[in-house]
Amino acid sequence: MQGNMYLNISQVIKAFSIVALGSISASAIFMIVVLFFKTVSACEAFFGILSAASGFVIGAYIPISQFSNEVQTVCNLFPASQITIMLRNILLNGLLDHINTSLQGVDQGMFVLSLKEYFTFQAKLFKGYLDMNKMLEYILGVILFCIVAQIMIYSGSYKKN
């Protein structure tokens, strides 16, 4: 096998942790959404449409950076977008550092910088940017909010008689 590995064990653990965090945040959000459906078929239809649209929202089909500032802000309000950005940072930063080193300063780092801008390595939110720590705080805040909302909704909907 040829080639180099640009991920260390710490980055692999971080990547798995981010995927787990993404699963938890999606579950927390959609547990609230599911409460409003009366039938399984309506829920399935909604999530079928949502799964197609979510590729655009998280930047899987088209990088979020290609949209207007307003659309970027709306997309980055969803934790899944930030999870995607965090995962992209963890998985590609080592490779991009290697590319930058290989170019030996010929372009003063502009190639890697333009790749990071094009492929959205920071979440743009209301004319500002969120770094990795701010994205993590935001996602954890959304999870906490959703859990509290679920407790309130469930306790109001399913009171004991």
Which residues make up each language-model segment?
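Membrane-embedded alpha-helical segments of multi-pass transporters/permeases
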Residues: 27, 56, 60, 147-155
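Membrane-interface interhelical loops and short interface/amphipathic helices
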Residues: 86-87, 92-111
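Alpha-helical transmembrane segments and their short interhelical loops
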Residues: 1-54
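Transmembrane helix-loop junctions in multipass membrane proteins, especially transporters and channels
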Residues: 2-6, 31, 35-39, 63-68, ...
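Junction motif at the cytosolic side of a transmembrane helix
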Residues: 102-161
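Hydrophobic alpha-helical transmembrane segments of multi-pass membrane proteins
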Residues: 16-20, 71-74, 140
